[in-house]
A protein has these predicted regions:
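Alpha/beta enzyme core
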Residues: 1-69, 74-123
Length: 123
């Protein structure tokens, strides 16, 4: 179940708790279009992902089901999602926006490498 990023964090947390109480067995955070980075480069990537990272941090501590962190993530921010408590990540637009299959493979490998660097288990 996806918790809307348009809610304040405390309401996102409560909604996640309510969804789990109603039987949800996982929760997904999102960042949507609310994150418009002001900075270029790595700092901009972190700014863009900050709404979903903040939600993953708050929600993962409030519920006992896996939390999937999605929206605006990159190879730079995937390790931050794990550190925030996410059990998994969603990176659809990072791949789907590309039209070249080789570029898609390269992005997936880069994302895998970013996660492997933090947790050196073979993926």
């Amino acid at each position: 179940m996806t918790v809307p990023h348009t809610l304040p964090l405390d309401r996102q947390e409560q909604l996640a708790i309510d969804l789990v109480s109603a039987g949800a067995d996982w929760i997904q955070t999102e960042g949507g279009t609310s994150a418009n980075p002001l900075s270029p480069g790595v700092q901009g990537l972190i700014e863009k992902a900050s709404p979903t990272l903040a939600a993953a941090h708050v929600i993962s501590r409030a519920v006992a089901v896996p939390v999937l962190c999605a929206s605006g993530l990159s190879a730079v921010t995937l390790p931050l999602a794990q550190a925030a408590g996410a059990a998994g990540v969603g990176v659809g637009s990072a791949i789907n926006r590309l039209s070249d299959e080789l570029a898609m493979v390269a992005v997936v490998r880069g994302l895998r490498d970013a996660l492997s660097a933090l947790n050196p288990v073979q993926i």
